[in-house]
Amino acid sequence: MRHGYRGRRFNRTTEHRKAMFANMSAALIKHEQIVTTLPKAKDLRPVVEKLITLGKRGDLHARRQAIAQIRDEAMVKKLFEVLGPRYQARPGGYCRIMKAGFRYGDNAPLAVIEFVDRDVDARGRDSGPTQAAAEAAE
């Protein structure tokens, strides 16, 4: 019986899982919509919902807890200055998961995880080294 086992292991060590969810949380906060596999999206949702709740609290201790979780100061700034006030009146349920078919190659189920009431312009903004190189050239 598997009673009481929460979450999935994803065939990774604990540290690798924590790093993976930190990176995915930062990507979701940055772009407000990401595509990943369905099990990863299902396990990412509670992590991000707790981060949004920290952003709604807005005090110094909550900010330090968020920094310890996602390790990206710019994303923590967005979390507390943009997302926290945006969801101040909403009592939870900040993310939505939509199934997105199956991945070519290994047929893994894909999902789109996004924020409810997301900023549609945030998707793909300043993403990747090519964008950074283009901005540096200007």
From Swiss-Prot:
Under SUPFAM superfamilies, the record lists: Prokaryotic ribosomal protein L17
Q: Which domain of life is it from?
A: Bacteria
Q: Can you list the GO cellular component terms from the UniProt entry? A: cytosolic large ribosomal subunit
Provide the GO biological process annotations: translation
Give TM segment ranges.
none
What is an example of a GO molecular function annotated in this UniProt entry? structural constituent of ribosome
* Keywords of the record: Ribonucleoprotein, Ribosomal protein
- Per the similarity annotation, which family is this? Belongs to the bacterial ribosomal protein bL17 family.
Q: How does it assemble?
A: Part of the 50S ribosomal subunit. Contacts protein L32.
Q: What protein does this entry describe?
A: Large ribosomal subunit protein bL17
Traced from the root, the source organism's taxonomic lineage reads: Bacteria, Pseudomonadati, Pseudomonadota, Alphaproteobacteria, Hyphomicrobiales
